């Protein structure tokens, strides 16, 4: 091979490396996205894609502002190997996870109070604030009959 061939090969390798770095997701950090939906009195959380969750914790934001170590209203830890999960509901059981403190139940959420959800999946961590709304079904049951 002559000098011109080596230069063309080097240019192709450099252009290939530039393409891979700028137009692929190989070197971009993974970002976990969380959304919530509070229909019918139940809060459902959706993750951007399925993750093997290692920890879930829900804490009141007002308590978190006054106390760095606020007690969670709901906390789950992975005991060994959780199932890849994309959707879960507040207080529901998730396969492969159990309460951080044995025999504890999730506390009921107070409507209008802001809570923060912390989710961990290995080295990935994310948080999401949400405010539960009043359950319209409960309001309809509470109305007096005319």
Regions found by a protein language model. Give the residues of each.
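N-terminal non-catalytic regions of secreted/periplasmic and cell-surface proteins
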Residues: 19-70, 129-146
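Short, exposed beta-strand-loop hairpins at the edges of beta-sheets
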Residues: 107-109, 114-132
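Alpha-helical interaction segments
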Residues: 9, 16, 64, 80, ...
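Extended, solvent-exposed segments with strong compositional bias
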Residues: 65-104
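Short beta-strand segments and strand-loop junctions that repeat across beta-rich extracellular domains
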Residues: 104-111, 137-139
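Hydrophobic membrane-insertion alpha-helices, especially the h-region
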Residues: 4-22
């Amino acid at each position: 091979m002559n000098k011109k061939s080596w230069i063309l090969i080097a240019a192709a390798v450099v252009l290939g490396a530039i393409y891979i770095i700028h137009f692929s997701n190989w070197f971009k950090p993974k970002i976990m996205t969380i959304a919530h939906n509070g229909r019918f009195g139940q809060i459902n959380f959706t993750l951007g894609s399925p993750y093997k969750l290692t920890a879930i914790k829900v804490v009141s934001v007002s308590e978190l502002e006054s106390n760095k170590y606020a007690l969670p209203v709901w906390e789950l830890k992975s005991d060994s190997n959780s199932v890849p999960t994309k959707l879960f509901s507040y207080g529901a059981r998730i396969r492969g996870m159990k309460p951080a403190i044995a025999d504890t139940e999730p506390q009921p959420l107070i409507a209008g109070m802001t809570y923060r959800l912390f989710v961990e999946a290995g080295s990935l961590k994310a948080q999401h604030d949400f405010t539960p709304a009043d359950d319209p079904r409960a309001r309809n049951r509470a109305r007096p009959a005319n």
